[in-house]
Swiss-Prot record:
Designated gene of the protein: tdrd7
Domain Tudor: 494-551, 684-741
Superkingdom of this protein's organism: Eukaryota
Family: Belongs to the TDRD7 family.
Gene3D superfamilies: 2.30.30.140, 2.40.50.90, LOTUS domain-like
Keywords: Cytoplasm, Differentiation, Repeat, RNA-binding, Spermatogenesis
Compartment annotation: Cytoplasm
Annotated spans, Disordered: 300-331, 841-883
Protein name: Tudor domain-containing protein 7
Gene Ontology cellular component terms for the protein in this record: cytoplasm; ribonucleoprotein granule
Lineage: Eukaryota, Metazoa, Chordata, Craniata, Vertebrata
Domain HTH OST-type residues, every copy: 1-67, 220-289, 330-398
GO MF, any single term: mRNA binding
GO BP, sorted A to Z: lens fiber cell development; lens fiber cell differentiation; lens morphogenesis in camera-type eye; post-transcriptional regulation of gene expression; spermatogenesis
Main location: cytoplasm
């Protein structure tokens, strides 16, 4: 199956995405650990007959399939499945066209026009029509990608591009974060871009403004001409025609129409026109008729020189003292002397220095008329440097070139290469003002990036990895190689600082580059798609064709969240270079801006590593860390937390603990002395951020571990090890004066385990955990003896003693807990102990788990006794929530598919109600995380609130198992889960107002009763976790809302020009599957 998945991807599958790709088709990840391999790449290297591994140009590891005829048919089916999963284009299709179905086992046809679930407002229809198709939009596939120049306006076009992939918060695969209001406004600006105007309409409008007899107000021609005279007199050194409209508007607060601008060169009584040919295109300079017009060579070329400056065409002429001729010098002789001067200065001679140098060399003054550069075009070329003051460099022409100018017949004797190099380029469309469009930040939740280099945490150069980014760039570079190697027009004859060119790098690769300096025959270029600079020979620089301006520069900068205060710290920079540079990482984008604020994650190992948090920990003062050794003993130890697997967190007396108390007192004084303002509170929470939380009258350091919404999140107390759910509004930023002091103190919670007890046995029994918590958490003074320090797992093996039992090992907690019959209890403690007993035994710390450790557990088959209803609270009695209103047959609704088993069973949620469900779940999280647990007498088919993966859901209990687990059905999402009975709490009436959101559904239009696993995978990949449109065929009502069932057509309307009817796709799949091989 692995080979088939790889064969369906002709361009290979990145190693970082292979697991997800494999799971999307099979439903399971590659079980490489079960086969004895520690990493996926190690397993792939062991099967060279199936997988071929290569490293791409950008350093990404790509996996390719080794061809096998046996899997060709499976690969074809996978490829067919993939073909209908193309990403959408730059626009969103808000209207679904009526499409007649094929007569193959269909029962009915859709009869309504449907709409795409809430992406764009109605004005999107107006925006879409004049928008040209984007060559770099997401609708293009990699194989058919073209790089044609798209005319402006570019910013509006790219404002629309991200709309298609921006799904709601509920559809994010990981780290579901509800955006704060200030960030939500920014997203709304992407979803509601400013409507674009038709450039043709603007042009027509400008024409009407100057056409006589039109209905528009007619401009006074004499006023415009007088204004132009004033401008040209002010700019006696000349004025670019292309700059005239802007200057005119700034001076006279009026627009100079495009048609009027075309007429300006023909007004010979007002201005004179000088045409210049630079870089193969023609520019015009205007001069007042009252000022003598300077002349420049029409074929301006560039020569390498040691005084390289930006080559900007000039507007001004030098003011030089009047020179008198030294007699009647023949013209040819004068040119020969000037040629000798220029030949002596092989790197060029400044124009204003020519008279002085000529006089020093020949003891004669240079005639004034010679300063007209038109008369020197046959012996020198001119490099125009700046406008004000006038600067130009003169270069001597070769003898062959001078002869060529004087005698065209000599061309036959000149080598063809020389003629090609020095032949003037034909005028063409100017490219010096062309700029690529801005880089659009990917809309996916966690895009991949390659970290190129960094000089500060606020200036980290990255490149996005993906089809529309690195893959598109590789395709463009292949085209650049063909263009620069074969096209004769690609040769460049004029260089300037800041110019975009194509530069030849190693391995015969051509890259886009920007010139940053010119020194002799060497050019320093910055590769704009990679973010680093290099010095190359001038012969390796080529003209950048306009087709290569369509792709945005791929190298961009970002800021690392949480490291702003230490952006230039050498320790942070060194750690970041070691952990991130040259690696492909996942990125979580917190703020989308010109320089995004991000969190980097290394996902190459078994666990995701937060690079930002890992670098921040490098600031810890090692001198404050505990130096633990085997057989060392400590007294006055405080046990701060007991976890459900028997892990303990302890605080030992140390210099670090003393400094922590002292610094936290300063924090308290700082907050009391200042007025409470908004900047003291955490405004942008993210995983790995360290902040302060006020707990039991004292400030404590906490690290954010999970963000549930804009109001609720999970934190871990750094100095006690406790995990809790808190409100965002309860967190405060560390005061800047004390930030480094608090960060430098190592966490004071020492992670320990009891020696001589089995490790990695899973969760302890609830009775054992509760006994341990009751014994050690209430003891003010404990003692420990260190047995072993495991640095690999950051675990300390200890013997734990209460205050009166040290150092007798037989009376240690380790011995007492094994002597107790705590491991025999398999029934959940809440179902067998009275509420008063539980309340008296409850302590602080993390929740105890529900599972029994295998190996210590002996009674696996004991039955659960019926709970005593008098000993625990029962479910409150109140009315059911109102039933969810469903459309009638023939009507449609926008839905989100939360669960998809097969076409005969999937679960939908009403799209328009999702935001209400998010609010309810957020309130449930805050309510149950801040209230004390209650013992609950669980009953089958009753409603409760249950905690599943750090979130609370409204559930229906389906069964109670003998090992303390409860089978529940999520009434809003349609999933079945197993949870600990201690994670089930009464569902209060406050959370019963919203109708249950899960709609059990069946696909209409298909007749198959039994679906194969392969067909189920195809169906799941096309509908699960996606916003779709449902056309209801039948509603089967029932007494209970969770037993209602809908039969509906499902349609994917996300593509710009195609609607995917899921029942048609499944029917076609069955036909393909039933064909003979």
């Amino acid at each position: 199956m692995l080979r088939a998945v790889l064969q369906a991807n002709k361009n290979g599958v990145p190693l970082s995405k292979l697991q997800a790709e494999y799971k999307s088709f099979t439903g399971e990840p590659i079980p490489f650990k079960d086969m004895g391999f520690h990493a996926l790449d190690a397993y792939l290297k062991s099967i060279p007959s199936v997988v071929r591994i290569e490293v791409s140009r950008v350093g990404e590891v790509i996996c390719y399939a080794v061809v096998c005829k046996e899997t060709a048919r499976i690969a074809a089916l996978v490829a067919h499945q993939r073909s209908s999963k193309k990403k959408s284009g730059g626009q969103v299709n808000c209207q679904m066209r009526l499409k007649y179905t094929a007569p193959v086992s269909h029962f009915g046809k859709p009869k309504a026009t449907l709409r795409q679930p809430g992406f764009t407002p109605p004005q999107e229809k107006i925006i879409r029509k004049p928008v040209p198709t984007s060559a770099w939009g997401k609708g293009n596939t990699f194989g058919s990608r073209t790089f044609e120049y798209s005319p402006p306006p570019i910013p509006q076009l790219f404002g629309i591009a991200p709309i298609q992939m921006h799904l709601p918060n509920i559809n994010r695969p990981e780290r579901k974060v509800t955006l704060p209001p200030r960030f939500q406004r920014e997203v709304n600006s992407f979803l509601n871009p400013t409507p674009m105007t038709d450039s043709n309409a603007n042009h027509t409008q400008s024409l009407k403004s100057v056409v006589p007899g039109s209905g528009q107000p007619r401009c006074d021609l004499s006023v415009i001409q007088n204004n132009l005279k004033e401008l040209l007199n002010k700019h006696s050194n000349g004025l670019w025609l292309s700059k005239l409209p802007q200057l005119y508007k700034e001076t006279y607060k009026q627009d100079l129409g495009g048609e009027m601008l075309k007429q300006v060169p023909s007004w010979t009584h007002i201005c004179m026109v000088q045409k210049l040919v630079t870089m193969g295109h023609t520019e015009m300079v205007l001069y007042s008729t009252a000022i003598k017009q300077p002349s420049f060579t029409k074929n301006v070329q560039n020569h390498s020189n040691n005084q390289a400056k930006p080559n900007v065409p000039v507007d001004s002429t030098p003011s030089s003292p009047p020179l008198q001729s030294s007699g009647n010098i023949p013209k040819d002789e004068l040119k020969q002397k000037i040629s000798k001067v220029l030949t002596k200065y092989s790197n060029g001679l400044w124009y204003h220095a020519l008279p002085k140098v000529f006089e020093d060399m020949f003891k004669q003054k240079l005639p004034t008329e010679v300063l007209n550069l038109d008369s020197l075009t046959d012996i020198c070329t001119v490099d125009l440097i700046s406008e004000e003051p006038f600067k130009a460099i003169l270069y001597a022409k070769s003898a062959e070139r001078a002869n060529q100018n004087s005698n065209p017949s000599v061309n036959n004797n000149i080598p063809q290469k020389l003629q090609d190099r020095e032949s003037p380029l034909l005028p063409e469309e100017p490219e010096m003002n062309m700029t690529p469009p801005p880089l659009v930040i990917p809309s996916e939740a966690s895009p991949s990036v390659l970290v190129v280099e960094l000089s500060s945490t606020n200036d980290v150069v990255i490149r996005y990895i993906g089809r529309d980014y690195s893959a598109a760039q590789e395709h463009m570079e292949d085209e650049m190689k063909d263009f620069c190697s074969k096209s004769s027009t690609a040769k460049i004859g004029f260089l300037r600082v800041g110019q975009l060119v194509a530069a030849k790098a190693e391995e015969d690769v051509w890259l886009r580059a920007q010139i940053s300096a010119i020194e002799g025959k060497k050019v320093k270029v910055c590769y704009v798609d990679y973010g680093f600079s290099e010095i190359v020979d001038i012969t390796k620089v080529c003209k950048l064709g306009k087709q290569f301006y369509t792709l945005p520069f791929q190298a961009t900068k970002c800021r690392l969240a949480g490291l702003e205060a230490f952006c230039d710290d050498s320790i942070i920079i060194k750690a970041l270079e070691l952990k991130a540079c040259g690696k492909i990482l996942a990125v979580e984008i917190l703020e989308k801006s010109e320089k995004p604020l991000v969190v980097l994650y290394d996902t190459s190992g078994d666990d995701d590593i937060n690079i930002n948090a890992a670098c921040l920990k490098e600031l810890c003062d090692r001198s404050l860390s505990l130096q633990l050794k085997a057989n060392s003993s400590f007294s006055n130890v405080i046990v701060t937390n007991v976890c459900s697997d028997g892990t303990l967190f302890c605080q030992l007396p140390s210099k670090g603990l003393a400094k922590l108390y002292e610094t936290l007192q300063k924090v308290d004084s700082e907050f009391q002395s200042k007025q409470v303002t908004s900047h003291l509170y955490v405004s942008l929470p993210f995983c790995g951020k360290i902040c302060l939380y006020h707990y039991k009258g004292k400030w404590a350091r906490v690290e954010i571990t999970s963000v549930h919404s804009s109001r609720a999140l999970d934190v871990q107390f750094l100095d006690s090890g406790t995990i809790a759910s808190v409100k965002v509004s309860e967190l405060k930023e560390i005061p800047p004066p004390l930030l480094r002091d608090l960060i430098s103190i190592p966490p004071q919670a020492l992670r320990c385990c009891l020696a001589d007890l089995p490790l990695r046995i899973g969760m302890w029994t609830p009775d054992a955990v509760l006994w341990l918590r009751n014994t050690v958490l209430n003891c003010l003074e404990c003692s420990i003896r260190v047995v072993k320090v495991d640095e690999a797992t950051n675990m300390v093996h200890i013997y734990l003693f209460t205050s009166n039992n040290f150092p007798d090992l037989e009376r240690s907690i380790n011995r007492q807990i094994t002597n107790e019959e705590l491991w025999k209890h398999q029934k959940d403690v809440f179902l067998n102990l009275s509420a008063s007993t539980l309340e008296s035994s409850r302590g602080g710390g993390a929740q105890a788990s529900e599972l029994s450790p295998p190996g210590l557990c002996k009674d696996h088959t004991s039955a659960v006794k019926k709970p005593d209803m008098q000993q625990s609270s029962s479910v409150p009695s109140f009315n059911m929530p109102p039933p969810l209103p469903l459309p009638r047959p023939g009507e449609h609704m926008d839905v989100f598919v939360s669960v998809a088993c097969h076409p005969g069973h999937f679960v939908c949620q009403p799209w328009q109600e999702l935001h209400k469900l998010e609010v309810v779940m957020e309130e449930m999280l805050l309510h149950y995380s801040t209230t004390e647990e209650k013992p609950v007498a669980l009953e089958k088919n009753k409603l409760y609130a249950a905690k599943v993966e750090n979130k609370w859901y409204r559930v229906l209990v389906k069964g109670i198992l003998t090992n303390g687990l409860v089978s529940v059905y999520e009434l809003d999402y349609g999933r079945h889960e197993l949870v600990s009975c201690r994670k089930v709490q009464p569902l209060i009436e406050k959370f019963m107002q919203l109708p249950f959101q899960a709609i059990t559904s069946q696909l209409a239009g298909v007749s198959c009763e039994h679906w194969s696993e392969e067909a189920s995978i195809v169906f799941r990949n096309h509908v699960e976790k996606k916003p779709l449109v449902a056309l209801v065929q039948t509603i089967h009502e029932s007494t209970h809302p969770w037993d209602r069932r809908a039969v509906a057509y499902i349609v994917d309307t996300s593509l710009p020009d195609t609607d995917i009817w899921i029942h048609e796709l499944m029917t076609e799949y069955h036909i393909q599957l039933s064909k003979p091989e």
